[in-house]
Amino acid sequence: MKRQLKLFFIVLITAVVASALTLFITGNSSILGQKSASTGDSKFDKLNKAYEQIKSDYYQKTDDDKLVDGAIKGMIQSLDDPYSTYMDQEQAKSFDETISASFEGIGAQVEEKDGEILIVSPIKGSPAEKAGIKPRDQIIKVNGKSVKGMNVNEAVALIRGKKGTKVKLELNRAGVGNIDLSIKRDTIPVETVYSEMKDNNIGEIQITSFSETTAKELTDAIDSLEKKGAKGYILDLRGNPGGLMEQAITMSNLFIDKGKNIMQVEYKNGSKEVMKAEKERKVTKPTVVLVNDGTASAAEIMAAALHESSNVPLIGETTFGKGTVQTAKEYDDGSTVKLTVAKWLTADGEWIHKKGIKPQVKAELPDYAKLPYLDADKTYKSGDTGTNVKVAQKMLKALGYKVKVNSMYDQDFVSVVKQFQKKEKLNETGILTGDTTTKLMIELQKKLSDNDTQMEKAIETLKKEM
């Protein structure tokens, strides 16, 4: 489906998380055929005795379901693996929705790492993206409740909710400090591929995640661009948090010769399974791939495969570095255990976990692209000081205004705000709130859209290949 592309780093004025980061494989994968060693009942004598002791001796009434759920959670937590988790019925339903259909929430992929709940990437066009949420932002509180000690699904359950309702997030961003956001939840669409024809017959294709329909969406996008005369392609995987592994394999095959490696899977016994391109490649025209620190999991599989097996240049920043594979087993009551079952390796056998993939052509965005969102519901005025004032000063400076960045809302800054309001035909109050803040976010978005230095580098690189 054709649609005007939006940059993954858009800063806007509204706001509104989805699911945990995972590289998910479905039941028809050979990985699910791996057998595990059986465990004798004697191994669970201690567990059974503890259960009986709690049932008989605890001073209050107990709930069998809660005890069993707690035991499973404890076993999963003992693995010390942020990608393995136990999901109750509600959490499992939310997880399924994020890879198969639209869902309601704020639209951001999150993970638990070293006891912290972190943003992997906001989903394209989501309230989270519009709010200016960035990869690596740490979630501190949800509606005033600390997420410390929670697993990722517990945190997600707090963040998600019905369309139109709001959730308050307290985030911490490296180099900025704590940020408070009030985000309106919305329906997060399932569409994952967006394409358009750029100048010089360059087909730009943005892939936002890997869901059940992504391979078909990509094929349709390529067919459409081919009919329009595309002579080369830019695949934009920036901010893509991953998803279904088989989709990444199918999509990679479109750009890789039959018989060449796409990826490898390594099991705990050391055996490896090599996934190869099983069909003739579809795209033979020059291609480049854009990546950044929000490119993760299945997106990293595709990026690495195209580079190592088709010599496609990667452009941008070092990727996230998520190199494990999960399966999900559903139980009769609707609960699910999502478990890491293997490592995945690149086509050449490299494990990129916690390291990421370094691009061949480094390209960074302007510093102002990393500025946090300013809440339009809050008021900043003369006499105020602090981080948010400093952010506003940096934004106006990026837009060309002469601003002293000193974190102080002094008379000089009041004058600058009035200049901005006059230019944008707003009431000249010198106060930053409401429509003024909203307009500031929109104007910064426009500047970012016009100064996508990574996309410019991708176009420059592709032209040399064409």
UniProtKB/Swiss-Prot annotation:
It comes from the Bacteria. NCBIfam families: prc. The keyword NAD does not apply. Pfam families: CtpB_N-like, PDZ_6, Peptidase_S41, PG_binding_1. GO terms for cellular component: outer membrane-bounded periplasmic space. One of its GO terms (molecular function) is serine-type endopeptidase activity. The active site is at 297 (charge relay system), 308 (charge relay system), 322 (charge relay system). Disruption phenotype: Sporulation is not significantly affected. Its EC number is 3.4.21.102. Induction: Is expressed only during vegetative growth. It catalyses: The enzyme shows specific recognition of a C-terminal tripeptide, Xaa-Yaa-Zaa, in which Xaa is preferably Ala or Leu, Yaa is preferably Ala or Tyr, and Zaa is preferably Ala, but then cleaves at a variable distance from the C-terminus. A typical cleavage is -Ala-Ala-|-Arg-Ala-Ala-Lys-Glu-Asn-Tyr-Ala-Leu-Ala-Ala. Keywords: Hydrolase, Protease, Serine protease, Signal. The gene is ctpA. GO terms for biological process: proteolysis; signal transduction. Belongs to the peptidase S41A family. InterPro entries: ClpP/crotonase-like_dom_sf, CtpA/B_N, PDZ, PDZ_6, PDZ_sf, Peptidase_S41A, Peptidoglycan-bd-like, PGBD-like_sf. Residues 1-36 form the signal peptide. This is Carboxy-terminal processing protease CtpA. PANTHER family: CARBOXY-TERMINAL PROCESSING PROTEASE CTPA, TAIL-SPECIFIC PROTEASE.
